[in-house]
Every structure is written in structure tokens, then in C-alpha cells.
């Protein structure tokens, strides 16, 4: 399948910048299995749409506050987006900085959490947090909720609860 088949124009005014204040106010896409017709319905209508024998999959996952902002030991700004936890103090993630990143460089997040760039694996980096603080504790205390690029605003406390 070609990637360009997924490109389409979506008017900016149709992109939600904030989640619905109540989940039942959220919208969902409903596809009729017989006609392939697509309809957009309020989530509060879900009970009337479910039939005996339908399979329901519940997703109770939460978005980890996986984005951190910091500085390199040289003073340059850096952004980390954690892709996965490797062990208690080590993560695999994307690093974005104004200049190239060197293995062995120190990063200081939020002025108090130190980490070391240990290795590069293609587009990702292995980062080890220093000291007693685990990676998950660092993310929980200083991490930001990663929002999709089309939501052009900083994250907030509501995002931590809703995502």
C-alpha cells in the first residue's frame, strides 16, 4: 500500500484542540458492515449501536508523560521523546537538538535531573538517567504529555488526566 493514499486535506477547524469535557460528548466513526457507509455519531449513542455478538475492545492505557525538555552540558536546548523503557534507569528515545549530539554528552532536564547519552541506534538514542531517580520517576515528575503535531499548543494538566 502506498503511503500517499493516506494523505488528505483536513480543515483546521475540524481538528479538536482539547478533548471533549465529557467522554460521552466525544464523537466516533461508525462503519456499516453491510453498506460500508460511514457516519459520525455521538459516543452517547453507542448502546443503541451494539448488537448481540459484537466484539468490544476496551483500551484502558494511559499516555506516559514521555516528553522532557532540557539542556546539553554545552548549554544548547534539547528535547527527549521516550519511545520505551529499557530498564529502571535507561530509555530509548528520540532526541532533538539544534546541533549534532555526541555519545557521552550529559543532559540536564528541568535544571535538576541528569542523564547521559550512551549510544545511538539509527534515529534513536539510549539515554541513562543518573543518580537514584529512575527513568519512570523522572518522567512522572518532570515529563510532559506528548501531543500530536496537529495540536499546536503546549500540554497541560488536563492532558495528563485525559490521555
Which sequence ranges carry the predicted segments?
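A cross-family signal for N-terminal binding/gating loops and helix N-caps
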Residues: 1-163
Amino acid at each position: 500500500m502506498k503511503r500517499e493514499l493516506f494523505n488528505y486535506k483536513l480543515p483546521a477547524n475540524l481538528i479538536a484542540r482539547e478533548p471533549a469535557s465529557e467522554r460521552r460528548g466525544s464523537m466516533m466513526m461508525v462503519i456499516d458492515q453491510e453498506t460500508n457507509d460511514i457516519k459520525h455519531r455521538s459516543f452517547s449513542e453507542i448502546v443503541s449501536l451494539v448488537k448481540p455478538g459484537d466484539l468490544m475492545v476496551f483500551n484502558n492505557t494511559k499516555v506516559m508523560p514521555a516528553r522532557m525538555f532540557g539542556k546539553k552540558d554545552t548549554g544548547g536546548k534539547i528535547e527527549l521523546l521516550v519511545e520505551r523503557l529499557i530498564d529502571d534507569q535507561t530509555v530509548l528515545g528520540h532526541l532533538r537538538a539544534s546541533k549534532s549530539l555526541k555519545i557521552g554528552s550529559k543532559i540536564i532536564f528541568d535544571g535538576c535531573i541528569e542523564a547521559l547519552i550512551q549510544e545511538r541506534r539509527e534515529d534513536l538514542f539510549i539515554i541513562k538517567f543518573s543518580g537514584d531517580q529512575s527513568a519512570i520517576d523522572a518522567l512522572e515528575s518532570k515529563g510532559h504529555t506528548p501531543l500530536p503535531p496537529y495540536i499546536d499548543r503546549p500540554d497541560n494538566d488536563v492532558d495528563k488526566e485525559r490521555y
